[in-house]
């Protein structure tokens, strides 16, 4: 049987990126989209006063470290369907939702979308004035802590089975 990546697969990431570009109404670099994508799910890692929409799991920072291929595939999928545009300049490459992308995203509905949009708005409010460089530096200085609350989980499992 073929194993399929259900969580954080290309389609899910593409929808999340479209949600980010549609909600924030601004063109963003790949780096910023990657950062927003992570914090849209785990906002409490950026601001402990906020609630994350996904549960805290061990080693969740690995989803940030290992997502580059999936992000690029998701952007390629969105570009190929004219749901986003790419703005190229000498300084950067930025992506923005097209009218078609905005219309498609508007057709989606449900409680998860509401939570995701709320989380994206909060993340954008917290991060919009920060540079990509600042956010990258913040991530690399903090990511060791994200998921470390489960550091001794395996020790507890061993104790539970010793008798």
Language model segments and positions:
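Short, highly charged low-complexity linear segments
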Residues: 72-82, 92-103, 131-145
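Short, surface-exposed, charged/polar-biased interaction segments
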Residues: 38, 42, 54-57, 92, ...
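Short alpha-helix boundary/capping motifs
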Residues: 64-65, 106-107, 129
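Conserved, aromatic- and glycine-enriched, well-ordered alpha/beta core segments
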Residues: 5-93
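Exposed, interaction-prone assembly regions rather than primary DNA-binding/catalytic cores
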Residues: 110-163
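Accessory beta->alpha helical hairpin/"wing" motif in late/C-terminal subdomains of nucleic-acid enzymes
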Residues: 86-124
